[in-house]
Amino acid sequence: MAHARPKLPRINLRLDAEYPNDPRVQQLHLQILNNPNYANNVRAPLSYLVFLTAQEMYEVFVRQARGVNKKRSGGPEKPILPANPGAGPQNAPGCGGGGSGSGGSGPPGGSAPQIQPPNNGVPSNQVSSNSGSAAGSGSGSGASSNSGAGSGAGAGSSACPSSGAGSGAGAGSSAGSNVQAPPAPPPLPQVPMVPGVVNGQEMYLPLGPVNGLPQQLGTAGSDNSGGQASSPGSQNPPTKPVAPRGKLGKGR
């Protein structure tokens, strides 16, 4: 990294000629002349000269460093390597790999019984038979219009770079669609259930206020004060408040 490190720039300035003409230096001289008792009237010009030198050196250094960084960042881009180099050529996006199948050969001909497989809509020229030498058929299919079928060791190709090959009576299939399944919705929070009685039937009600039910289940008394609200988990009906006796009924 030593070659990329910028060198210390060389400043070609005649500070003895440009320093008195600098407007900031002239303002500093005026401040010193207007205030003879200025504490730094001796050290201020020298300190300001050092400040100008350091500032100019820093600006040149930053400009050179930025130029070196631009040259380094504008180089050729590195080729993007595949994550798995040994996986071979990748299929085109949206195309699934062709299926491949392999199956065992049929029994030899001669005295072996002839087994005719059921014809489920397959042409007669594609139905394998066990006469003489064994012959089979394999098929491969993909979810992105990739399909291949062959007889014996045949192979089929598709619109995508992938192909399917089958031999014997094997069959293979692959789904090559790159469409990702939608994420599952988050689970709903579990509400604790407590038993309760609604319309004479025992039901399980969630904790908290329920829509359609009164907040207080007690009846109002004579003093215009509501009864105590029963807890949601209690199955006993609320007690009826006792009306106060009149003055005339004390002796009876």
From Swiss-Prot:
Biased composition (Gly residues): 94-109
Bias (Polar residues) ranges: 213-237
Segments for region (Disordered): 69-252
Sequence ranges of Low complexity compositional bias: 83-93
Biased composition (Pro residues): 182-192
Superkingdom field: Viruses
Family label: Belongs to the herpesviridae small capsomere-interacting protein family.
Subcellular location: Virion; Host nucleus
GO annotations of cellular component type: host cell nucleus; viral capsid
Protein name, entry field: Small capsomere-interacting protein
Assembly behavior: Interacts with the major capsid protein/MCP.
GO biological process: viral process
Signal sequence bounds: none
